[in-house]
Amino acid sequence: MSKNDNQDISEFDPLNREFTEAEKQQQMQQEQEFFSQSILDIVDDGFIVASSSQSTPSISVLSNSLPHGDQKSDPITEAIRKEILEKQRDILREYLANTNPELAAQIAKEEDDKKFRAFLSNQDNYALINKAFEDPETKKNLEEVEIVGYRNILSTYSAASGYPGGFQPVQWENQVSASDLRSTVVKNDAGEELCTLNETTIKTNSLIVAKQDGTQVQINSYREIDFPIKLDKADGSMHLSMVALKADGTKPAKDKAVYFTAHYEEGPNGKPQLKEISSPQPLKFVGTGDDAVAYIEHGGEIYTLAVTRGKYKAMMKEVALNNGQSVDLSQTIAEDLTKVQGPSHVRHTPIITPNQELELSIETHSNQQVPPITTFNKPLQPEISQTHQLQPQQAQSSGIPNLVLNAAHALSISMQDLLHNINASLTQKQDINKQSDLIKEAANTILNNKKSDFAEKQYNIIALTENTLSNKDIIADAKVNVVSALLETIQNDQNTLDIQKSKILEATVAITLNSENIELKQKQQILEKVVDVSLSIKDDISRAVAIDSITDAVIKSNIANKDKEQIFMTIFDQVNSYEFSNITKQKLLGSMLKKAVETKVISPEQQQLIHQNLDKITTEHTKRDTIEKVNNILLDPFSNTVLKTTNIQVITANVLDSPVPVEIKSELIQVVTQKVAESALEPKDKTEIVKGIGKIIATHSDTSLPLYDKGVIMESVAKGIVESKTDLRERELITEGLVNGIYEVKGDKAVVHAISSVIANSNINQSEKEVLKKSQDIVSERVLDKEIQNLDGELKEKNIEESKLRDDIYNKTQDVANELNIKTFLDDNHGKREVSEEVPKNTSSLLNDISQRTIEKVNNLRAMLSQDANLKTFEEKKDESTKKVDELVKAFDNKSSTEEQQNFIKSHLIDNKTLSREVRLQIIDNLLKAQAQKRAETIENLSAKTEDVRVVSGKSELEPISKDEPYIQKAKMVVERDRVGIKDNIKIMGALINARDSIQSENLNKSTHIKKESSVPQR
């Protein structure tokens, strides 16, 4: 064999190799041994169900007005089309091209096969199609595709293969009254009943059918299942797959099983609708009546289906009514391909990973069936010792599924020859691109082998990957390129389902990470490529399975935890940077984070980083959702301005109450305001809506939204107006309306000052700033003038004189006492009378105190309203608070002892009520951060040394030892010191935390105290 660089892999393609009879017999014996170990030989009925809350979107919704080639179906339906129907069309195409060359133009291969579909749907061509069915070779190929296709689908989408909610046994229950009647209740994954299936077994000796070769076969037993036509119980979707039975009523072996499948998709009302039927071909009936049972001829045997002619016609009618498709090949394949989905009302269904259940019961069968010899099932040769083999125990330790381990027993000489010849062709001097091309071609040979099932292909790809990584003739960096080429081949392969690709990728990660033939650097590079391929998978379920599987493989690998963390963060960055919807990213990253936290493979710091990114993604999603809601409200033609304002206020209130930081709230409110300002509504309507937004913010509960936060959010409202792409005059009116709204609800003036600050600091030109500032000032001045006038008028009407006020209070108190007829118990008891007279005296004294405080408040208010008053803006108050915080933090730092610092905390933070609650809490927060930082620095620099000068007196650092020896000085001692004092640090942090709790409870204590004082005293 030539070893030049231009060598074609076809030289050692196992498909071209001839085998001796001895080799075939040896391989057949190995296959029999392999299948004798398997317990997966007999199949049973299966179904897949999903509730409306977790099902995939309806096919009619996702494929509305789209041709078949562009439809997005659920994975099961798509797998049947790709694994069976498309391959059967290709077989028919090949037959027709060979027998009728003149049809080449009509049956040419296209992306959506429009021409061929038109050909197959034309009744004039049925005679040609029937001839194809009658051709022995074509019929055999069609049957083999159907058997292998169903076997692959049912194994791929099974729970044992790791598919979420995969195949599990159907629980048929015999009825007491008759042994030939069984039933089962089908429920969605929410536990709600979708339907009850009844199966009736019919014994007979009067049904005889003729096979294609003329041989007569008697049907002794068959069954009927009452497939539901309409369902109106619970919401959801389901697929019912019933295995075809042999003529004697028994189940076939796994390698010969075919199914009759009814696909029910969730309809507009949430109830399942019959949308498609998948049946073997060509379908026939034993008789012409509605009770005639369906049957097929497969592999020279007769099989009955659990459906009658009458039931089949009713189901097909319902399929047509629901705009579904029949994928029954005997009814011409075109019915699956040419029928375009009719118009339907599109429901926006979240694209989330469905939790579907596809059930399959597999029983043991004593009569083992041996499959035909394929190119990957041929005898082993002595040369395999020269090829590196992945032994079953090695594979299991690498995280390879058991299904693949079973396939290892059937690894053929063809694969061994392939690996051997690859190794013989790879040389160190060979160009990397040549090496990559060689591996790609080998991968294509494996994946395109039509006679191999998926388990075989998967194992062979794994063996090829392991062989590549262990090959000493490929340098480490080149192995990255070669394996990447292999991964690209898998990515681009059209014959492999997405869910199958995810399984191959998982195994690739396990082999790569556990390989001893490459360094961590190369492992990471290969893993990045695997993740890229996984993220390119279009099917949401398969993509999620792939990323989850990769995550599991990383966790289970034998690399160090610190390396696992690094790999985790790399995968996280790849997912985060991919162009997915926010919901998709949340699900992928959330699942990764959960696994990482549970297994403790990433540090708390990295966990926090991922949490922050998830919060950011959530914010973006919330923003888009909010924008959509606002647009729907603004564009609603049936709602007036009042209703629009109310609805926008509801959205605003929900944002204000949401458990997110004030910065995010501000961002969302700004978006809402800007959308309103830029809408096509009339200026007066926009003004009213924004005015409503301002009112909601200004009057929102101070508990959930402190004044400072209100100011920050009001700044975002003003920013939304100022930066909106609308006319200046409209912005002026909207700004005026916003300020008016705040004053109408008596909002804090600091909130209004926040608007001024935004206008002054905005990026708009100076002339626009002046216009907007003027509109705000006009409103503020108008409101302030009105308040001053009202207050002055009220004060002037009342002649407040303290002496007269005291007399009035006493007289009124006496009048009240007389009115209540307060008397002593004994008129002749003068002492008791004095007690009685004390009542008005004490009452008037109390009221005098109250009036005195009222007068002080009035005078203070007058002073505030005077021109000499020192009214501070919101920004000034904010700056003053910041300075006060910095000043007290500095004062705390100047305290030298722990005791002094503890006293400072009590006197200046807990007991000092002259400082606002917010300022004191901010000081504590700053001090806690500083203490934590000092402790962290100490722990990080335990070996740091500090000069500690030991002196006798405080006059000088260094003094002579004695007068007699002045040249000998006291030495500096370089010692290791506890630079923070961990115990003292803990005491201070504890004191700060206690102080914070005390301050935070002040409002609660205050409200409780007031409530107690204001309660009505008992008599």
Curated annotation (Swiss-Prot):
Lineage: Bacteria, Pseudomonadati, Pseudomonadota, Alphaproteobacteria, Rickettsiales
Region Disordered: start-end pairs: 1-33
Gene name tied to this protein: sca4
One cellular component term from this protein's GO annotations in UniProt: cytoplasm
NCBIfam families: Sca4_fam
One Pfam family from the record: 120_Rick_ant
Protein name: Antigenic heat-stable 120 kDa protein
Keywords of the record: Cytoplasm
Location of the protein in the cell: Cytoplasm
Biased composition (Basic and acidic residues): 14-24
